[in-house]
């Protein structure tokens, strides 16, 4: 494989929309959660491969704002899987010099997923904030995890933030440019994807 890609132009930013894990499992007569677990294994391998190939940004859209409409049982299972996956991802990121950044609305997640308060429990849990903090100095690929993310939701939150800054006198409406709007988005500082795969 290495020889085959030697002369190819590697995209700077690849984005993956994770879709169909539940259907994959159902087609094989397995519970949907098995499909989600297999999806995580695939993402882990993809992170390592993308970092090795020299891709600068890899974005995975893994849990959209629409996913909260699934059954409480499935959402609960996905949150447990997310907790487990964050711990594994920290090891992978450190091993591969990968910086991790999460985009999306964090407000709906349980506090242990967002930030660990006090001492770590005996089984070390990794929060999103800890994962971002501990990989912030890594200089390799940036792995962007889009969770509880939706484009319309992102724009809505950005506009609200801009309006508050206008009310506080930090922003003058007449001075708002495309770059100003971009700076309020979750994706500020992240280039647009060159390749989107679903």
Protein language model features and the residues they cover:
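Flexible, compositionally biased loop and terminal segments
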Residues: 1-198
């Amino acid at each position: 494989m290495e020889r085959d890609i030697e002369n190819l132009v590697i995209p700077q930013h690849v984005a993956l929309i994770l879709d169909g894990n539940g259907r994959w499992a159902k087609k094989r007569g397995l519970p949907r959660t098995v499909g989600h677990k297999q999806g995580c294994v695939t993402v882990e391998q993809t992170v390592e491969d993308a970092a090795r190939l020299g891709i600068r940004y890899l974005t995975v859209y893994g849990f959209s704002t629409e996913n909260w409409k699934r059954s409480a049982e499935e959402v609960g299972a996905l949150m447990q899987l997310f907790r487990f996956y964050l711990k594994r991802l920290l090891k992978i990121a450190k091993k591969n010099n990968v910086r991790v950044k999460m985009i999306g609305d964090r407000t709906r997640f349980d506090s242990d997923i967002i930030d660990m308060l006090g001492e770590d429990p005996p089984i070390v849990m990794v929060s999103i904030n800890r994962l971002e903090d501990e990989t912030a100095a890594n200089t390799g690929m940036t792995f962007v995890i889009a969770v509880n993310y939706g484009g319309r939701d992102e724009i809505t939150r950005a506009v609200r933030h801009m309006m508050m800054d206008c009310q506080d006198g930090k922003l003058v409406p007449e001075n708002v440019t495309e770059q100003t709007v971009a700076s309020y988005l979750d994706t500020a500082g992240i280039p647009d994807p060159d390749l989107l795969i679903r």
